[in-house]
């Protein structure tokens, strides 16, 4: 799915168009379509942290044209490491996508409102180890 970036992803302010697709049962990829060769690995935060909760500020809701009927998704960026358990998740800057109008924003959460969310949390803290 091709998406228009309505509010820049930090550090990638010139990127206006991205492609979002599923890699496997857990991970997704958000790839630049603006001639720049970069992408982000993403995960649905609720798969690993069911208590993840935040309010999308009005500004971002307006940019995305969100309302009660909007079909939308929330994803967080993962920095993949070896072994996978050493990978980190950024819960402090979720990416919100409006599937109805193919747009996205990165929401930067206020640390004073969300003191339990960090930009580099080990994924191993949220997944069960299977042996």
From Swiss-Prot:
Disulfide bonds: none annotated. Pfam families: FliW. The keyword Nucleus does not apply. InterPro entries: Flagellar_assembly_factor_FliW, Flagellar_assmbl_FliW_dom_sf. GO terms for cellular component: cytoplasm. Its main location: cytoplasm. One of its GO terms (biological process) is regulation of translation. Keywords: Bacterial flagellum biogenesis, Chaperone, Cytoplasm, Translation regulation. It is found in: Cytoplasm. Belongs to the FliW family. Interacts with translational regulator CsrA and flagellin(s). NCBIfam families: PRK13282.1. Acts as an anti-CsrA protein, binds CsrA and prevents it from repressing translation of its target genes, one of which is flagellin. Binds to flagellin and participates in the assembly of the flagellum. This is Flagellar assembly factor FliW. The lineage of its organism: Bacteria, Pseudomonadati, Campylobacterota, Epsilonproteobacteria, Campylobacterales.
């Amino acid at each position: 799915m091709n998406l228009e970036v309505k509010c820049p992803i930090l550090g990638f302010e010139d990127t206006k168009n991205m492609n979002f697709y599923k890699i496997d049962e857990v991970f997704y990829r958000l790839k630049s379509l603006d001639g720049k060769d970069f992408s982000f690995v993403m995960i649905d935060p609720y798969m690993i942290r069911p208590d993840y909760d935040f309010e999308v500020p009005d500004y971002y809701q307006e940019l995305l044209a969100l309302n009660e009927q909007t079909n939308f998704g929330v994803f967080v960026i993962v920095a993949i490491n070896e072994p996978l358990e050493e990978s980190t998740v950024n819960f402090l800057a979720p990416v919100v996508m409006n599937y109805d109008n193919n747009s996205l924003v990165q929401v930067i959460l206020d640390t004073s409102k969300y003191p339990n969310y960090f930009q580099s949390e080990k994924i191993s803290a949220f997944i069960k180890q299977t042996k």
